[in-house]
Amino acid sequence: MNAEHSERLTAPLPWWLIAVGTGAFTGWLVRVATTFEIGLVAAVAAAAIALAVVAAYGAVRVQATPEGLRAGRAWLDRAHVGTIEPLDAEGWARALGREGDVRAFTLTRPYIRTGVRVAVEDPADPTPFWLVSTRFPASVARALGDGS
C-alpha cells in the first residue's frame, strides 16, 4: 500500500528575518532623508513586500501519490514514472552538479539539501528525469512506489 506525501517547501526562519530586516533598513534610510512617519510607512511597505516575496517563494508544494508526482504546477503521471532515487545531501549536490542534465525538469530550493530524482518513462517527453527538492526523499519515493 502506497502512502501519500505532501509538503510545502517553506523558506527557513533566517529568510523571514532578513525580510523584516529589509523593511527596517529601508525605513531607516527613508527616515534619514524625510520624517519619522514617512520612514515608518516605508518600513512597513518594504517589509510587507519582502515578506510576500519570501512567502510566495516558499509556497511551492510537492505532492506524491499513487497517481503521480506534482512539483509546483508540474505533473508527472504515475504511468510515466521510472526509477525513483531518494538523494541525500551528497547525492543531491552531485545530481545538481556533475551528474546533471540541462534537459531535466528541476524544482529546487537552495535551503533544502535533499531531494529525489525521478526518471521519466515517456518516449514523447524529452525530459530524462525530474529533480525535486524535498525534506523527505524517502517518503516521496515510498508514495510513488518502486517505479517498475
Question: Where would I find each of the regions flagged by the language model?
Answer:
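A short linear-motif detector with a strong N-terminal bias
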Residues: 40-43, 48-49, 61-64, 94-99, ...
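Single-pass alpha-helical transmembrane signal-anchor segments
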Residues: 20-27, 40-55
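C-terminal/domain-terminus segments
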Residues: 127-148
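Non-transmembrane, membrane-adjacent beta-strand/coil modules in membrane-associated proteins
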Residues: 72-131
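N-terminal membrane-targeting/pre-transmembrane regions
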Residues: 1-33
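Conserved beta-hairpin
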Residues: 46-85
